């Protein structure tokens, strides 16, 4: 990739973060999966980049792009954090078009000089290089959902087609999705309460769609559909999903997404339970 040969060592030293990709879609596709708010907070460490989007202090989405997904990943500090307009970033990443020409890849080099500086994007396709400068902002403190593995009560790993089926079959005109996890039947049940009445979808723990089932005790929790609907973007791209609930009823949906080069990235959604559960 020409972009990889355009900078010498001295030019590198001015940047605290440099990351390059031969195929920009390996980044843009994952970021689109969490694009339900305009702004995002970016955290970079030697392990890679985490991009976080939040809404109403009730839901948080994190996209993880591991360092080895990049052809080049150089970070000069222990961690680098900045806030950015995600809508503008995605527009820039697709500046050569969102529908790729067969056999043509858009290469990317991202450079960040540090606090107060813009995020520099160098995009190259077919010998044409475009430079974008995106203003960065003071990072806001993100929510700590304190989703500790020791407090996880139930965990199910599902092939994503099973959850896609649920979202297409259940009546989504209601306000909430109810998730029931039990050591006994129905094991794993999704319920909605819409205009056409109540609907349920059950997954036996020995179903071909269920890859793992761990349940310590029965839990029934409700989550606002308006908070969960943005996660369907990640669901559509994913091959597997890990569904976990902790002792407070908080929900974690972790989607495993395989990019065009066969590498794995993760998108995780945290959602707090709906406290307005009606009396049965």
UniProtKB/Swiss-Prot annotation:
GO terms for cellular component: checkpoint clamp complex; nucleoplasm. Signal peptide: none annotated. The keyword Lipoprotein does not apply. Expressed in testis, uterus, bladder, spleen, ovaries, lung, brain and muscle (at protein level). Expressed in brain, testis, kidney, heart, liver and lung. Keywords: DNA damage, DNA repair, Nucleus. It comes from the Eukaryota. GO terms for biological process: cellular response to ionizing radiation; DNA damage checkpoint signaling; DNA repair; meiotic recombination checkpoint signaling. Its main location: nucleus. One of its GO terms (molecular function) is double-stranded DNA 3'-5' DNA exonuclease activity. It is found in: Nucleus. CDD domains: PCNA. Belongs to the rad1 family. Component of the toroidal 9-1-1 (RAD9-RAD1-HUS1) complex, composed of RAD9A, RAD1 and HUS1. The 9-1-1 complex associates with LIG1, POLB, FEN1, RAD17, HDAC1, RPA1 and RPA2. The 9-1-1 complex associates with the RAD17-RFC complex. RAD1 interacts with POLB, FEN1, HUS1, HUS1B, RAD9A and RAD9B. Interacts with DNAJC7. Interacts with RHNO1; interaction is direct. Component of the 9-1-1 cell-cycle checkpoint response complex that plays a major role in DNA repair. The 9-1-1 complex is recruited to DNA lesion upon damage by the RAD17-replication factor C (RFC) clamp loader complex. Acts then as a sliding clamp platform on DNA for several proteins involved in long-patch base excision repair (LP-BER). This is Cell cycle checkpoint protein RAD1.
């Amino acid at each position: 990739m020409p972009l990889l040969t355009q900078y010498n060592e001295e030019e590198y030293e001015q940047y605290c973060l440099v990351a390059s990709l031969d195929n920009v879609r390996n980044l843009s596709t994952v970021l689109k999966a969490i694009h339900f708010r305009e702004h995002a907070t970016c955290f970079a460490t030697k392990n890679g980049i985490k991009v976080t989007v939040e809404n109403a202090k009730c839901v948080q989405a994190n996209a993880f792009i591991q360092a080895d997904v990049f052809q080049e990943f150089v970070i000069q500090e222990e961690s680098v954090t900045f806030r950015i307009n995600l809508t503008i970033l995605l527009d820039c990443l697709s500046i050569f078009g969102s529908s790729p020409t067969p056999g043509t890849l858009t290469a990317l080099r991202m450079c960040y000089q540090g606090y107060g500086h813009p995020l520099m994007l160098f995009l190259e396709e077919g010998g044409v290089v475009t430079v974008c400068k995106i203003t960065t902002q003071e990072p806001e403190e993100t929510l700590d959902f304190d989703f500790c593995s020791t407090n996880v009560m139930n965990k199910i790993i599902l092939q994503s087609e099973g959850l896609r089926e649920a979202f297409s079959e259940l009546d989504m005109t209601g306000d909430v999705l109810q998730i029931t996890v039990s050591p006994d039947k129905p094991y794993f049940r999704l319920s909605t309460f819409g205009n056409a009445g109540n609907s349920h979808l059950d997954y036996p723990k020995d179903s071909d769609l269920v890859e793992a089932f761990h349940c310590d005790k029965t839990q029934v929790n409700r989550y606002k559909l308006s908070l969960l609907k943005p996660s369907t973007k990640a669901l559509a791209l994913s091959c597997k999903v890990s569904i976990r609930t902790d002792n407070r009823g908080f929900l974690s949906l972790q989607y495993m997404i395989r990019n065009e080069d066969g590498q794995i990235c993760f998108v995780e959604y945290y959602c707090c339970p709906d406290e307005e559960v009606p009396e049965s």
